[in-house]
Amino acid sequence: MLDESQNIKNSESLTFRSAIRLQSKHRLVLTGTPIENSLKDLWAQFHFIQPDLLGTENAFQKQFIMPIRQGNARAKVLLQQLIAPFILRRSKKEVAPELPALTEETIYCDMTEEQNTCYEQEKNSLRNILLQHPQSTDRLHSFSVLNGILRLRQLSCHPQLILPDYTGTSGKTAQIIETFDTLQSEGHKVLIFSSFVRHLEVLAEAFHERGWKYALLTGSTNNRPSEIAYFTDQKDVQAFLISLKAGGVGLNLTQADYVFIIDPWWNPAAESQAIARAHRIGQDKQVIAYRFITQNSICLLYTSPSPRDCS
């Protein structure tokens, strides 16, 4: 059995190749996020448990991935019919009907004037790249565009993520601090997720300045159990700063009753998994999840239905 089987999603990775070589009579995979990035993730996991079902990777790309991207409903239905007999899915409603309700809200944040200036400068640079080579398929050009999009996402969070000398503030950071301040004064515990470690570091600095205790979990954390225990066992540690990749799965943190998603991710399944660290079996409090979105920024695209349609 492969637990957290989405980790073999890259068919070119050593993890995938090692898993495929395992010898066994029966194979199972267990995951809460079967699709993290694209439908290729699904192919990789089915290639492990039932190699012939979805054909080769190239055939799967032509028969399903491309047609589904183009809105072919028939291809989507066919794929669902093929994999349905091999999937046993349980939902919280079925196994834990007593679980308190989950409330999800979006908090929209305005940029500060200085932050907006940095954002507009970067946006103009990206626009110039696109205008100079509107039809280019060159890999270097594509990399420049993707890097520009990433920088816009980071600037919409806080310019310090990419501009070390920036001394101004961030509208989103101010809103996060204000919201947390209210919750911690009421005795709540909060999980704060970000896909950018630097974003967590900026928040950690702000928390330290205010004398707020916090736990921090990223990919470079040496002692995960210690950080987890610090948050769960200490009543006055009311914030747990967690990178989405390092702590989005595999943690039971029902001591928290609030979850902050402080920068949006295009795949809602990854965010749902993060929220499920608190909203899970064993939780006896209502859980409220806040998504912080910067107004007039590229992050608004990450909340629209089309790029997040992984169903």
Task: Identify the function of each model-found stretch.
Residues E4:
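Walker B catalytic acidic pair
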Residues N7, F16-K93:
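Conserved P-loop NTPase motor "coupling/switch" region that bridges the ATPase
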Residues N7, I261, R280:
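Residues immediately C-terminal
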Residues P97-Q115, E120, P134-L251:
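Conserved Helicase C-terminal RecA-like lobe
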Residues N252-D263, I288:
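A short beta-strand element within the Helicase C-terminal
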Residues A269-Q283:
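Conserved SF2 helicase motif VI
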